[in-house]
Regions:
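Active-site-proximal cap/loop segments of hydrolase catalytic domains
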Residues: 1-138
């Protein structure tokens, strides 16, 4: 999205990591060790900054819908909040849905239905509804 933004008309972020440093700082010790192997060590904040989308938020020039569970044990909800604030600071109007009774992702049926309805509505409004493809007869 950040590097090919002109290809996209909208963005839906679900439980996304946006700031690698704050993500690692707020992650449990055992999970941090696993993630540092994948993303880089917390002891190298300059590198983490280079791979953190939050520091490139000025390149996001399309509407954004953000979804997150308030009790997410893997990606703290603060990640979603940081993105929403960064976009608002740039005069954008992100849509934010925080499910108060969810963890990582939307597991409860009512939350999945609600969020997916918001996604469809958001995409209809931002990139437009498309006609369904005709399915050829076999």
């Amino acid at each position: 999205m950040l590097f090919r933004s002109r290809l996209f008309g909208a963005c839906v972020d679900v439980v996304g990591i946006v700031n690698m440093q704050t993500f690692l700082e707020k992650t449990s010790d055992y999970r941090r060790k696993l993630r540092e192997v994948e993303y880089g060590p917390l002891s190298d904040p300059e590198f983490l900054k280079t791979i953190s989308p939050i520091h490139k938020a000025d390149k996001i020039n399309v509407p954004v819908l953000i979804g997150h569970g308030f009790n997410d044990p893997r990606v703290p909800v603060e990640e979603a909040m940081q993105l929403a604030v960064a976009l608002k600071d740039r005069k954008q109007s992100p849509r934010l849905f925080i499910a108060p009774d969810e963890g990582h992702g939307f597991q409860k049926l009512e939350n999945r239905i609600y969020f997916n309805e918001r996604v469809v509505q958001f995409l209809d409004e931002t990139i437009g509804a498309r006609k369904p493809m005709a399915i050829p007869n076999p």
